[in-house]
Amino acid sequence: MGEIIHRSKTRPVRVGPLTIGGSNEVIIQSMTTTKTHDVEATVAQIHRLEEAGCQIVRVACPDERAAEAIPEIKKRINIPLVADIHFDYKLALKAIEGGVDKIRINPGNIGRREKVEAVVKAAKERGVPIRIGVNAGSLEKRILEKYGYPTADGMVESALYHIRILEELDFHDIIVSLKASDVRLAIEAYEKAARTFDYPLHVGITEAGTLFSGTIKSAVGLGAILSKGIGNTIRVSLSADPVEEVKVAREILKTFGLASNAATLISCPTCGRIEIDLIRIANEIEDYIAKIQAPIKVAVLGCAVNGPGEAREADIGIAGARGEGLLFRHGKIVRKVPEEQMVEELKKEIDKLAEEYFAKQKENKAALKGSAAQ
């Protein structure tokens, strides 16, 4: 588990309007918990996921009713839609026909070659990529007999088996995942996969657990994987509201500087010098910036003596003192504000910074468009 692996040469694969792999940013994915045939509930949950920053969403497609709901769901959402298929190739065909942007299916599990050929033909015609999803808990019997128990080598071998089936049919729009609930096994499997083939990798720790324990497990496992330059899409799997999965994924990516569209909070751990209700303020500001899709660093600090210096890298922040706070930008004090106005004043400044960022982005796009037209 040694050197850093740079994935800049990963094969690019289109998923709807997004390009996965290549030198593109890591994309956040989640999965709905609703019954897919319940279109209203599924669309409502996807809208909440979109608002939280989800960029690709997967839905279970276990039966005909779910597959038939795909066109209506697709029509009413704004992010790429993935259908999760197990065994039944007819459901894959129906989902592709219904407009999904990607399917998750293991070609070796859907029966005779002509069934696989039918799915690949439909996927090719529609430009729909296929994700091969290897899971340590459901490896093929022959692999378990060979290795005795789930191993990283066995997981990569399973992935290669499914990859070769698709490659033999001249299909290369492939994304691969190798998930395990054992963090060390997942890390090793992804490392080996990154050395073995150049298809984009969807990374995740499966069955991670509840919001608290699963967040920690995912942060440790995915952090280790991402730190090696591995991973093109990410999903945090939690026994919780899927919106929480997206929030955790965004925080993990922000930690590595891999989220270009997310605001970050810096806050101190508190101590005996604190004269303000810093924990409440920090939580309120964290909630406020959660949906801001701009790379702004915000600091909430409890000490007016050390605060500005400690948060020099922050774009905007407050440092509290008794009855008042110092509002600062880029480590320089802008003005003093009364304690009761601190939060609202900080929110106003955050909004200004976000507006400045979006205006700059708009200018840059216009300039690029202009130079391309010349």
UniProtKB/Swiss-Prot annotation:
GO terms for biological process: isopentenyl diphosphate biosynthetic process, methylerythritol 4-phosphate pathway; terpenoid biosynthetic process. Pathway: Isoprenoid biosynthesis; isopentenyl diphosphate biosynthesis via DXP pathway; isopentenyl diphosphate from 1-deoxy-D-xylulose 5-phosphate: step 5/6. Its EC number is 1.17.7.3. InterPro entries: Dihydropteroate_synth-like_sf, IspG_bac, IspG_bac-typ, NO2/SO3_Rdtase_4Fe4S_sf. Binds 1 [4Fe-4S] cluster. Disulfide bonds: none annotated. It is an enzyme of class 1 (oxidoreductase). Transmembrane segments: none annotated. The keyword Isomerase does not apply. Belongs to the IspG family. Converts 2C-methyl-D-erythritol 2,4-cyclodiphosphate (ME-2,4cPP) into 1-hydroxy-2-methyl-2-(E)-butenyl 4-diphosphate. HAMAP family: IspG. PANTHER family: 4-HYDROXY-3-METHYLBUT-2-EN-1-YL DIPHOSPHATE SYNTHASE, 4-HYDROXY-3-METHYLBUT-2-EN-1-YL DIPHOSPHATE SYNTHASE (FERREDOXIN), CHLOROPLASTIC. This is 4-hydroxy-3-methylbut-2-en-1-yl diphosphate synthase (flavodoxin). It comes from Geobacillus kaustophilus (strain HTA426).
